[in-house]
Design a protein with these regions (language model features):
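Outer-membrane beta-barrel pore domains and translocons
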Residues: 46-48, 72-74, 125-129, 165, ...
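Solvent-exposed, glycine/polar-rich loop segments of beta-barrel outer-membrane systems
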Residues: 137-147, 191-209
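Gram-negative (and chloroplast) outer-membrane scaffold detector with strong preference
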Residues: 59-173
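Transmembrane beta-barrel architecture of outer membranes
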Residues: 52-54, 102, 159, 219
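Short sequence motifs at beta-strands and strand-loop junctions characteristic
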Residues: 35, 46-49, 95-100, 150-157, ...
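Outer-membrane beta-barrel "beta-signal"
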Residues: 15-23, 214-228
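Cleavable N-terminal export/targeting peptides
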Residues: 1-33
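Transmembrane beta-strand segments that form the barrel wall of outer-membrane beta-barrel proteins
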Residues: 35-50, 66-74
């Protein structure tokens, strides 16, 4: 009888704590049993202007933790953004863009208890980008020759992102807005073209420089997707 009394008193002494634990237990149990969105396919159309076309897959591991991975292709970079260390690609006929694969993977933690992957979150991600192009050299009169120089930019990022993902109220379509800083390791083989006027006849000259450094980049974007 005394043991039963102690149990009853302990239950009434911590009503708030018991309620929180039971709520989290119910959410965790429902995540494993209820038919809800646990997979998401997403696109990031605005990254096209930065020379990347990726597709993302997010898989909910628990009601708060998920894994997001993406694979894509790098093409022409249209934007020169100083805060990301990018250079815009030349639109001239002598620039040949060479597509390369890009990939990223990371873990996402949602700050709220929800059966489905939505709400405010924090995410840490590793990303690899490679932009490659061949620059055709010009002859004495400015005509393009068959000789080329390879321009190559390789970026390895560790990104710390914060965002908000929301499923539609009447459908499984969603949006995901995010932003945050990244530590970027860069290895660049950069081709620079200029007209040399020091000789008797003007001619095109080329400098190829290799650099390896680290910088801080910043990201802000919007993904759209579908959950199932």
């Amino acid at each position: 009888a005394s043991a039963l009394s102690l149990f009853v008193l302990a239950s009434f002494a911590q009503p708030g704590k018991t309620k929180v634990v039971l709520y989290k237990d119910r959410v965790a149990a429902a995540f494993d049993t209820v038919d809800c969105v646990k997979n998401v396919i997403k696109a990031n159309p605005l990254l096209f202007f930065r020379g990347e076309i990726p597709i993302y897959y997010e898989r909910a591991i628990t009601h708060r933790l998920s894994l997001e991975a993406g694979v894509g292709v790098t093409l022409r970079n249209y934007l020169a953004l100083s805060f990301t260390g990018d250079d815009a690609d030349d639109f001239g006929a002598g620039t040949e863009i060479i597509p390369r694969l890009s990939f990223n993977a990371g873990f996402r933690y949602y700050f709220v208890d929800d059966l489905e992957p939505q709400g405010a979150y924090g995410q840490i991600t590793f990303a690899h980008l490679n932009y490659t192009k061949d620059i055709r050299m010009k002859g004495p009169t400015g005509e393009l020759t068959d000789q080329t120089l390879r321009d190559d930019r390789t970026y390895n990022d560790v990104r710390l992102l914060f965002g908000y993902q929301m499923l539609g109220s009447s459908s499984n379509w969603l949006f995901d807005v995010y932003g945050g800083p990244a530590f970027r390791d860069r290895f660049n083989v950069k081709v620079e073209e200029h007209l040399d006027l020091t000789g008797e006849r003007p001619q095109w000259a080329y400098n190829v420089t290799e650099t390896k450094d680290q910088t801080v980049a910043f990201f802000l974007g919007l993904k759209v997707g579908y959950g199932f």
